[in-house]
């Protein structure tokens, strides 16, 4: 008994002074001896409330040792009073103190569990109910129960809202028993079915669409709900532990939304009808390769000159319909770059290129995270099932976040609790974090992003560009392997080289793709507003010993009809007009400022259409 008590002393000190809440109270170590235990002298006195006659019979060193063990002075005084006798041995007092601890240990442990979940944002009554049903030891079961309660509350609130807001004509909106609606869900893709189901459960369409995109097309309903819940938990965690000035700002924003937003009426319109598998008209090593477009290109849009326009796939409602209507009503080709590399990048492409005899640039990229970055395998936990990264963004996770994750994981020597796993996985998917050490996650560096996007090493490095600008430029760029696969059909058509009008060039993704396809670029007229990006393209042009002409414009407005006609007369016309709008106003990661094609950057699409029409009009005149 005494020997196990000595071991318990060290365990108590860890709980009282350490960060870990996961303490193993069981031990088989019976080799410790009380004779080896030394009291540390320290001038600590118990409170004056203890009787003087008792205090005088206990040495200061003994009292100090009890305090160092973590016992309060009030508890020590009480133990001394109860054991007051002729002998007054310290061992008897220690036994009494341990009895006090044992009686409060269970309630203290239970309180820690309750406080843990309340801090994560769960209601106290839900936590208590879950612990009554599942006990206080199985954290995973408690977490699942709490998530279930949250979903039930959401569904109930959604149903209440429907009763209060909607008239009889809207009653069927939230009824899954409707035969027509069931048929529609059965005929739609897995993503569409999950999206509709989540909307019926009361989730915002934006949140649901982003979660589905992040989790992947094959994710189950449970995985998507877990992702949304983890996102909500993370937001609540940030609000709880935010610095005072940030917390006040969050609260003010909440109040502002409460007073300014009007209730949203349920909307049955689709964001956009995206294919279940984003393989476009076909991708390498995948069945379903098409030899002909499902909807032929209108005669008025046939090339040459050819054109190629890219934008993000997940856009606000109606955006792709508007893009298509301005580009000769050509049906978009939606492709996810995960079929070409280890990172997803869902994009839509409208072009008039042939689709037969496409080929992949060599060597092809590695297809999984572990193949692309083999050093991560050693540290990758079994509960992180990712093989692909999500879309590469223009910003990265903060060092504070990765530090917070490391601290959370280091609290547990054994199996990481399910709730912690879910939170970590949410942050990993959101920020594309990879494992670089034990319990250590890090965002991709710019060199790794270059590799995934298909650019040559150090393509964006040096030349005065900052790390922040590198991330921004890479996040808005083409995925070279994907674009090269589409442009590969041009190689046999232009054996003597090609003239390119490159609009919103960025860091030269289109030019890199043509170079890797070994298609000679006779002329490239580039329009790019960023000085850093223009420097990157110019450096690439020089380092790859291009023999053609590179002519640069900073302002797209300078490319009026007269300038375009003069350039075409000078260079003999353009064979390819390539471009794409930065995704700042369209992408889910920037949803707070998302305004569709009317945004500051995405409205450049209309300049693309204006210039393309001028090029095609001049080309018709030149052919006469």
UniProtKB/Swiss-Prot annotation:
It is an enzyme of class 2 (transferase). Signal peptide: none annotated. It holds the Pfam family DNA_methylase. One of its GO terms (biological process) is methylation. It catalyses: a 2'-deoxycytidine in DNA + S-adenosyl-L-methionine = a 5-methyl-2'-deoxycytidine in DNA + S-adenosyl-L-homocysteine + H(+). GO terms for cellular component: nucleus. Residues 160-189 are annotated as: Disordered. Its main location: nucleus. Residues 291-622 form the SAM-dependent MTase DRM-type domain. One of its GO terms (molecular function) is DNA (cytosine-5-)-methyltransferase activity. It comes from the Eukaryota. Residues 57-100, 108-149, 188-231 form the UBA domain. Involved in de novo DNA methylation. Controls asymmetric and CpNpG methylation. Required for FWA gene silencing but not for the maintenance of SUP gene silencing. Functionally redundant to CMT3 to maintain non-CpG methylation. Involved in RNA-directed DNA methylation. This is DNA (cytosine-5)-methyltransferase DRM1.
